[in-house]
Swiss-Prot record:
Gene3D superfamilies: Aspartate Aminotransferase, domain 1 (3.90.1150.10), Type I PLP-dependent aspartate aminotransferase-like (Major domain) (3.40.640.10). GO terms for biological process: lipid A biosynthetic process; lipopolysaccharide biosynthetic process; response to antibiotic. CDD domains: AHBA_syn. Belongs to the DegT/DnrJ/EryC1 family. ArnB subfamily. Its cofactor is pyridoxal 5'-phosphate. One of its GO terms (cellular component) is membrane. This is UDP-4-amino-4-deoxy-L-arabinose--oxoglutarate aminotransferase.
Length: 379
């Protein structure tokens, strides 16, 4: 019997082990020089002036919203088809998430849908770069600029994603994730990029108790030995153990994403005559990072439901994922917004299925997934 093939697996090697060993032997295992190196290296990738490493992308979203002053009575525009942490952070700050529909085939928000949702209470817009493809950020920024509303790009899926020749996040404020299934990972972690120095300073303080400096700053940069609280903050700093892993993963990102692209191209070609519908590619110039490969499973054309397909593949020893169940259909948000209807989001949320895609997949692994899907479809 074949070994179980998960939908995702982190691509780790001896370089990551050596990086962790170096930190463990250094005597400085929490936030320190590896964090600084990671922040500098990521700025070099995206072209931003500032970056702040954090313990998760969720933590990054929290401090970004706080740094913008989001509070009770404010509205924040976001798709419902996103990971629930974004909605949760908005609600926990006392603000209202304004959930909008997505394009039927790219699953990304459109500037038109954003424009229609703006009110005098709108204080932020959070578009999602979905599955490794970029949203039309120029058009979205144009809408936001006309109304004087800040944009926070959810780039959790977008390490290595390029839009019109520039890395996602360039010239803006964006949040990346280093969670275990992401294109680059350090188990748990995240990073915010921005060109707004005042915003960067505020987020850096908020992620570490609201202090002006962290322990490494005090020890190595000759600053005041006692830190001072500027405003109440959180404990969202990233340990150097994690940052060291992320640095190695960043060096491997281009190569790993190239392998992801090879796998995705095989899926696109060899599943083209099956009823499993892939997402459409954006019309604007871009470089896809292929964080996810998603098929839509419509029972009317596939002869099986999405959940049925997931069960069938599991029985064949193949893992799958769901990215995402629409937030407004989940208990808390359904009860809070019972009248909200988002047709494209709901249609896709019932049908999307993420199939295995990770850089250490072998060609035989890819063949196995394709064969299983073709078998289910009767091809």
């Amino acid at each position: 019997m074949n070994e179980f093939l998960p939908f995702s697996r982190p691509a780790m090697g001896p370089e990551e082990l050596a990086a962790v060993s170096e930190v463990l032997q250094s005597g400085w295992i929490t936030t320190g020089p590896k964090n600084q190196a990671l922040e500098q290296a990521f700025c070099a990738l995206t072209g931003n002036q500032h970056s702040i490493a954090v313990s998760s992308a969720t933590a990054g979203m929290h401090v970004a919203l706080m740094a913008l002053g989001i509070q009770a009575g404010d509205e924040v525009i976001t798709p419902s088809l996103t990971w629930v942490s974004t909605l949760n952070m908005i609600v926990l700050l006392g603000a209202e998430p304004v959930m909008i529909d997505v394009d039927h085939d790219t699953l990304m928000v459109t500037p038109q849908a954003i424009e229609a949702a703006i009110t005098p209470r709108t204080k932020a817009i959070i578009p999602v770069h979905y599955a490794g493809a970029p949203v039309d950020i120029d058009a979205i920024r144009a809408v936001a600029d006309r109304h004087g509303i800040p944009v926070i790009e959810d780039a959790a899926h977008a390490a290595g994603t390029y839009y019109k020749g520039s890395h996602v996040g360039n010239r803006g404020t964006a949040i990346f994730s280093f969670h275990a299934i992401k294109n680059m990972t350090c188990a748990e972690g995240g990073l915010i990029v921005t060109d707004d120095e005042q915003l960067a300073n505020r987020m850096r303080s908020l992620k570490f108790h609201g202090l002006g400096v962290d322990a490494f700053d005090r020890q190595t940069l000759g600053r005041a030995p006692q830190a001072e609280v500027i405003s109440p903050g959180y404990k969202y700093n990233l340990a150097d153990i994690n940052a060291a892993i992320a640095l190695v993963q960043l060096k491997k990102l281009e190569k790993n994403n190239a392998r992801r692209t090879e796998i995705a191209e095989r899926y696109l070609t060899e599943l083209a005559n099956t009823p499993f519908l892939p997402l459409s590619q954006p019309a604007w110039a871009h470089k896809h990072a292929w964080h996810l490969f998603i098929v839509r499973v419509d029972e009317a054309t596939c002869g099986i439901s999405r959940n049925g397909l997931m069960d069938d593949l599991k029985a064949k020893g193949i893992g799958t994922g769901l990215h995402f169940r629409a937030a407004h259909t989940q208990k808390y948000y359904r009860e809070r917004y019972p009248a909200l209807v988002l047709p494209n989001t709901e249609w896709n949320s019932d049908r999307i299925c993420s199939i295995p895609l990770f850089p250490t997949m072998t060609d035989d692994d890819v063949t196995r997934v394709i064969a299983a899907l073709r078998d289910v479809a009767g091809y």
